[in-house]
Amino acid sequence: MATTVKELKATARPKSGKGAARAERRAGRVPGVIYGNNQPPVTISIEDRELRQRILAGRFLTTLVDIDLEGKKHRVIPRDYHLDPVKDFPIHVDFMRLGEGATIRISVPLHVVKSEASPGVKRGGTVNIVAHAIELECGVESIPQYIEADVGSLEIGHSLHLSDVKLPAGVKALTREDATLVTIVPPSGYAEEQKAAAAAAAGGAAPAAAAPAAGAAAPAAAAPAAAAKAPAGGDKKK
């Protein structure tokens, strides 16, 4: 599977520490770091506006990035970012450097599909997403943007497990196979309706069992004696 690689420009940050980071933010830049692949970490800064757009676009943590650091390319993947707790803008970002042919453990979002075709949803049930992401291990060139969870055949009360999901080639799940991903939750009052329907069915079956089978013959009348005896003391021939 081909993985999309985005480009991002960065500037080397010669100083580290809280004071230097605050100075970068005042200048409209977000401090960050590139680490990993048995190389020393490199402190960088990125334009706040550009980084914010990348984060808001979605799938930021599963997208490969080529960081252009003063003419030198670094193939990385975002591993974490921090937002200001009040103003909600990025204040720091971490990138992990990737070597050629490396494998990576990554959390990939779950994408539910065909919910409108689910028999359970058609009967008033609701799709309940239990796991919003799946932990995977794969090559850096095979990172899926998301994993599809097809719920088109689920009835009310049924669940979709990890073992029901087809993963792309070369991708291994780190979560146990029986993990529940999605369930179809019954609507309000569904249990009472089911009990009432079962009681009505049981009540209708009892009188039916007591009634005689259709077309059954009525009890036969007592058969007359095969040959009636002559009355005792009858007239004799003279």
Swiss-Prot record:
Residues 1-10 have a biased composition (Basic and acidic residues). The keyword Ribosomal protein applies. GO terms for molecular function: 5S rRNA binding; structural constituent of ribosome. GO terms for cellular component: cytosolic large ribosomal subunit. This is one of the proteins that binds to the 5S RNA in the ribosome where it forms part of the central protuberance. Transmembrane segments: none annotated. Keywords: Ribonucleoprotein, Ribosomal protein, RNA-binding, rRNA-binding. The keyword Nucleotide-binding does not apply. Gene3D superfamilies: Ribosomal protein L25, beta domain, Ribosomal Protein L25, Chain P. GO terms for biological process: translation. This is Large ribosomal subunit protein bL25. Residues 1-24 are annotated as: Disordered. PANTHER family: RIBOSOMAL PROTEIN L25/GLN-TRNA SYNTHETASE, ANTI-CODON-BINDING DOMAIN-CONTAINING PROTEIN, RIBOSOMAL PROTEIN L25_GLN-TRNA SYNTHETASE, ANTI-CODON-BINDING DOMAIN-CONTAINING PROTEIN. Part of the 50S ribosomal subunit; part of the 5S rRNA/L5/L18/L25 subcomplex. Contacts the 5S rRNA. Binds to the 5S rRNA independently of L5 and L18. Belongs to the bacterial ribosomal protein bL25 family. CTC subfamily.
